[in-house]
Amino acid sequence: MPEFSTIVYAVTDQVARITLNRVDVRNAQDKAMLYELNDAFDLAAQDDGVKVIVLDANGPHFSSGHDLADQTTMADFQPVSNWGGYGKPGAEGYQSQEEEIYLGLCWRWRNLPKPTIAQVHGKVIAGGLMLIWVCDLIIASDDATFSDPVVAFGVNGVEYFAHPWEMGPRKAKELLFTGEKITAEEAKTHGMGNPVVPAQE
């Protein structure tokens, strides 16, 4: 089994649990975490003893989004797609990276051959939505909130492409234009989530 430093992987009673574990940065996703998530999803998908995959997080919040302080480059990792051009200057190189670590990985995870469940609590911000959208079911604690404030600080986000699919175009535009938080109960009414459960459970 691979060694993980940004997540925790465990299998109990045919359930693989993948836990985000960068608590000090509120589980912000750097490239290392994304590739470890990919390895963990592959591990669970290929394990005949695993029937269901659960994605959750340690700490007070599910995820604060992408780690904007990540200084690693694509040369530090082994790509899993056939995209190229990561080292090219400007927009071309940046787009290549986005295709691999955001769009490409998410596409792989959406197509896992086993049921996936996101178990979320606390804040789910921007890139945190990217992680839960790929799951078949989303179970939220009653203290969970969802937001995507990236428009407010002028950053593009691949999550944009999934928001209309997950909650409908009008609610997606409201979420992006205002940057306001959506509660777990409100998220459920817009089709963004499934059961809402008490945080202590």
Question: In which residue ranges do the predicted regions lie?
Answer:
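C-terminal alpha-helix plus adjacent terminal tail
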Residues: 1-16, 62, 70, 74, ...
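Conserved CoA-thioester-binding segment of acyl-CoA-metabolizing enzymes
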Residues: 1-58
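Hydrophobic/aromatic residues within transmembrane alpha-helices
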Residues: 18, 55, 67, 131-133, ...
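Histidine-centered beta-alpha loop that forms part of the nucleotide-sugar donor binding/catalytic region
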Residues: 21, 66, 121
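Glycine- (often His-adjacent) and acidic-residue-rich active-site loop
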Residues: 25, 57-105
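Charged catalytic carboxylate motif
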Residues: 32-36, 101, 108
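Glycine-rich, phosphate-binding/catalytic loops in enzymes
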Residues: 34-36, 69-73, 157
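Crotonase-fold acyl-CoA enzyme core
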Residues: 107-201
